[in-house]
């Protein structure tokens, strides 16, 4: 299954989760798209609930199914901690996500584009791989030639707050993941136990 590139507003309403991070797409129509959206009250099966939660998390980070599943498999090999939380930490440590958390992009999709286009440096070296795994303390910055890219400057200006687990210097356009986040600091709307149950049946 390839990465979803369709209308994010419709997908957000279908999942009941803001994929843009703004919440605007749910403000007026907090129901699934389609003719019968407002009256759709069908109950999901256990599998349906697990699948829906998996899709919410996958689309939230903008990953294709294969890449998402492979990351879950990597999480199963971490011996300490719980599987669900370890999986979410691996998602959080992706370079495109850290760029988004720092406020250098307004969405994860935009952050992925910035990384792909070579705008982002890690410890002074250009990294154009969105899945690059960031270590706490590494410096994430904007390449000098890209420091006047309007979309980056607009994203920084539009960012009102940042998570407690990152630091950011708006003048230098650089920051870092200062520590790994706690569970209550990321995606409180996600029940990762359902995602684990889904993949435990599939793998």
UniProtKB/Swiss-Prot annotation:
GO terms for cellular component: small ribosomal subunit. InterPro entries: Ribosomal_uS4 (IPR022801), Ribosomal_uS4_bac-type (IPR005709), Ribosomal_uS4_CS (IPR018079), Ribosomal_uS4_N (IPR001912), S4_RNA-bd (IPR002942), S4_RNA-bd_sf (IPR036986). Residues 93-156 form the S4 RNA-binding domain. SMART domains: Ribosomal_S4, S4. SUPFAM superfamilies: Alpha-L RNA-binding motif. GO terms for molecular function: rRNA binding; structural constituent of ribosome. GO terms for biological process: ribosomal small subunit biogenesis; translation. Transmembrane segments: none annotated. The keyword Ribosomal protein applies. It holds the Pfam family Ribosomal_S4. It comes from the Bacteria. PROSITE patterns: RIBOSOMAL_S4, S4. Keywords: Ribonucleoprotein, Ribosomal protein, RNA-binding, rRNA-binding. One of the primary rRNA binding proteins, it binds directly to 16S rRNA where it nucleates assembly of the body of the 30S subunit. HAMAP family: Ribosomal_uS4_B. Part of the 30S ribosomal subunit. Contacts protein S5. The interaction surface between S4 and S5 is involved in control of translational fidelity. Belongs to the universal ribosomal protein uS4 family. This is Small ribosomal subunit protein uS4. It comes from Streptococcus uberis (strain ATCC BAA-854 / 0140J). The gene is rpsD.
